[in-house]
Amino acid sequence: MGKFMKPGKVVMVLAGRYAGRKAVIVKNIDDGTADRPYSHALVAGIDRYPRKVTAPMGKKKIAKRSKIKAFVKVYNYNHLMPTRYSVDIPLDKTVVNKDVFRDPALKSKARREAKVKFEERYKTGKNKWFFQKLRF
C-alpha cells in the first residue's frame, strides 16, 4: 500500500478537542520516533471557521467574520482521516515544527503563523472546501 499521509494532505481530526475539524499535514513521521513509537503527523488546522459573508455587509463586518482560529498539534495516524483533497499552504517550517510544544511562546507563534497563512488563503478564495465547517 502506498504512503498517502503526505505534507499538504487535508485530513479530518477524529478524536480529542478538535474532533470534526479540518487540518493539513505539515510533517508526517511514518516510522515513529523514540518518544512516539507510532506513526504520527504534525498538523495545522482550523479551530474556528470563518462565518458566512453576504453582499450587503460592510467592510468592517466582513473583516470580523473572516477571522480564523488555528491550532497546531501532533496526532497519531489512527486519529486522522485523510481526504482526497490537498492544499498548498506554505507554512514556515522553522516556525511550525515539533519543537514548538516545549515552549508556550513558540507554540503561540506557530499558531499565529498558521492563522495568518490560513486567512491569506481564505481571502484569495481558493480551497473553499477547506474553510467550510463540516456539517455532521
Swiss-Prot record:
Pfam families: KOW, Ribosomal_L27e. Its main location: cytoplasm. SUPFAM superfamilies: Translation proteins SH3-like domain. Keywords: Cytoplasm, Endoplasmic reticulum, Ribonucleoprotein, Ribosomal protein. Residues 5-40 form the KOW domain. Gene3D superfamilies: 2.30.30.770. It is found in: Cytoplasm, Cytosol; Cytoplasm; Rough endoplasmic reticulum. GO terms for biological process: erythrocyte differentiation; translation. InterPro entries: KOW, Ribosomal_eL27, Ribosomal_eL27_CS, Ribosomal_eL27_KOW, Ribosomal_eL27_sf, Translation_prot_SH3-like_sf. GO terms for cellular component: cytoplasmic side of rough endoplasmic reticulum membrane; cytosol; large ribosomal subunit. It comes from the Eukaryota. The keyword Endoplasmic reticulum applies. Coiled coil: none annotated. One of its GO terms (molecular function) is structural constituent of ribosome. Belongs to the eukaryotic ribosomal protein eL27 family. Component of the large ribosomal subunit. Component of the large ribosomal subunit. This is Large ribosomal subunit protein eL27. It comes from Hippocampus comes (Tiger tail seahorse). The gene is rpl27.
